[in-house]
């Protein structure tokens, strides 16, 4: 590993807005950039630097150890055409068999915490206790957690990362039924009993917005409803699914707080995701569109957890298709978390959309907003592979400030932040490990987090997505997010330059950026050639 000492990289972030800025004026937060040097010492001593992965994306061993099938097993195997390369997570990156080696790499990289999910169908193959507990699956997670702890890495556990047991989907439609609330609560309680004395950070759901929209409005994720298919109703089902997720979250948090939190001394929250929505112009209609867009993505979940009901804009536009909370549920939802995890990848411009004349209603058009990555023919940020992600570090800053000011969230973690790149299969390993752009990405986003902290947002951790290259849902293996390169055929792991940077950053060392180092090496080589 290269531990060359050098001047730290200078990156650009947004300046601090006026502390009195109201959330209704979030579009006024300036985006002019200033320069700042990012160090480990800029963050609080108890700030956690980690990385993440999830069960279906990493474990593999889909039919080993008495694991039951999940909806992602069914989706990928029955509908391979919906995956970009026709692949699946049957083997994923083989973490089930390689976890000890993987955790050794985590320790070498200096991770302070690793965020992972439990496969519901690996511990409860039939989805509930009455259908039987899988002792092999329970042992695997005990061994995995124990190995993390033995290596000084804090486990951060997600209970649901989209891989619902197929048994519950078959029995009653999974999250389309209110019955899921009791079954999820039972599963959560089982995990609290089984693993809770070792876990200090619990997350009920990861990105419920993605699960509800991609799985029930677009048909691109399991269980594949909505979209162009005949199954599902994209005007109703995403709202029903989200409603049941919120009630299941509430039930699990109540269970943890009432029975476990005092003795286990852990925290429990939920991980949400949102793009930052920037008004396309200063016209009031676009400013209003910004608020609606944020309501429909972030407020859909945070408003009930703050006020006990959905955003006013959603009530007005979705009307009777939006479920209602009982008075008791509404009251108990308020403050039903210890922390909020925020997954951030990109930002977009938004403008007011003309109401669709289409007779087919959908969540996708209910907000009456048009999104675009360009303004005056200039992109909002550098476009990455696939075109959906643009590098917009200041969007993370604005999102954190907006979340704190609008919803008064006391504790935030950036639970995912990462950069997509193409899986280039015909390049040398040495080239595949060169990812200076990823290092630059994380430097700039960490700078935005630091600036948000300076402005009073209580951010307590940053988790790189992802630690390993892995199976990326409907994109299969055509792209990579990891700071550790994985050979998808041999499963060999190799640290990328970004992993070496992250190791040194966490350790508080100054490092030459990979791009700068290569420029210096090229300059030395040029001088040598000139002398000869």
Swiss-Prot record:
Mainly expressed, at low levels, in roots and, to a lower level, in leaves. Its EC number is 3.2.1.105. The record marks 388 as: Controls the gate shape and acceptance of substrates. Changing residue 481 to F: Reduced affinity. Transmembrane segments: none annotated. The active site is at 207 (proton donor), 416 (nucleophile). Pathway: Alkaloid biosynthesis; ajmaline biosynthesis. It comes from the Eukaryota. Residues 512-532 are annotated as: Disordered. Glucosidase specifically involved in alkaloid biosynthesis leading to the accumulation of several alkaloids, including ajmaline, an important plant-derived pharmaceutical used in the therapy of heart disorders. This is Strictosidine-O-beta-D-glucosidase. It comes from Rauvolfia serpentina (Serpentine wood).
């Amino acid at each position: 590993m290269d531990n060359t000492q050098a001047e730290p990289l200078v990156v650009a972030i947004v300046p601090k807005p006026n502390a009195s800025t109201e959330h209704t004026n979030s579009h006024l937060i300036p985006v002019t950039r200033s320069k700042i040097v990012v160090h480990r010492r800029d963050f609080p001593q108890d700030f956690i630097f980690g990385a993440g992965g999830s069960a279906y994306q990493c474990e593999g061993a889909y039919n080993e150890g008495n694991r039951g099938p999940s909806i992602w097993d069914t989706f990928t195997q029955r509908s391979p055409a919906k995956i970009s390369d026709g692949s699946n997570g049957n083997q994923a990156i083989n973490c089930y068999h390689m976890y000890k080696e993987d955790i050794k790499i985590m320790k070498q990289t200096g991770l302070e915490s690793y965020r992972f999910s439990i496969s519901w169908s690996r511990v409860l193959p039939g989805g509930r206790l009455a259908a039987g507990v899988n002792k092999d699956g329970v042992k695997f997670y005990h061994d995995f957690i124990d190995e993390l702890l033995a290596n000084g890495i804090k486990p951060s556990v997600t209970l649901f990362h989209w891989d619902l047991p197929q048994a519950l989907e078959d029995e009653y439609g999974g999250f389309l039924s209110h019955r899921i609330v009791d079954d999820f609560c039972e599963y959560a309680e089982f995990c609290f009993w089984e693993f809770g004395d070792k876990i200090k950070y619990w997350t009920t759901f990861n990105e419920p917005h993605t699960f509800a929209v991609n799985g029930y409005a677009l048909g691109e994720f399991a269980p594949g409803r909505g979209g162009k298919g005949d199954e599902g109703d994209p005007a109703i089902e995403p709202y029903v699914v989200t409603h049941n997720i919120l009630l299941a979250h509430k039930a699990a948090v109540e269970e943890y707080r009432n029975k476990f939190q005092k003795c286990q001394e852990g925290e429990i929250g939920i991980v949400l995701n949102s793009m930052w929505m920037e008004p396309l112009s200063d016209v009031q209609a676009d400013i209003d569109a910004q608020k609606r867009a944020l309501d429909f993505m972030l407020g859909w979940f945070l408003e009930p957890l703050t006020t006990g009901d959905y955003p006013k804009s959603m009530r007005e536009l979705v009307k009777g298709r939006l479920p209602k909370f009982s008075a008791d549920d509404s009251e108990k939802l308020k403050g039903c978390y210890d922390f909020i995890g925020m997954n951030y990848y990109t930002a977009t411009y938004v403008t007011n959309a003309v109401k669709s004349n289409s007779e087919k209603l959908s969540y996708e058009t209910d907000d009456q907003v048009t999104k675009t990555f360009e303004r005056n023919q200039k992109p909002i940020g550098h476009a990455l592979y696939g075109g959906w992600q643009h590098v917009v570090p200041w969007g993370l800053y604005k999102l954190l400030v907006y979340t704190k000011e609008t919803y008064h969230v006391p504790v935030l973690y950036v639970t995912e932040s990462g950069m997509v790149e193409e899986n280039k299969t015909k390049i040398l390993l040495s080239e595949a490990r060169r990812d200076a752009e990823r290092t630059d990405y994380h430097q700039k986003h960490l700078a935005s987090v630091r600036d948000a902290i300076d402005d009073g947002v209580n951010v307590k951790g940053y988790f790189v997505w992802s630690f390993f290259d892995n199976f990326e849902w409907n994109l299969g293996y055509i792209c990579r997010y990891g700071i550790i390169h994985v050979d998808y055929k041999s499963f060999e792991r190799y640290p990328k330059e970004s992993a070496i940077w992250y190791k040194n950053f966490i350790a508080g060392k100054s490092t030459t950026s990979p791009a700068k180092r290569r420029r210096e090496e090229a300059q030395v080589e040029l001088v040598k050639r000139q002398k000869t």
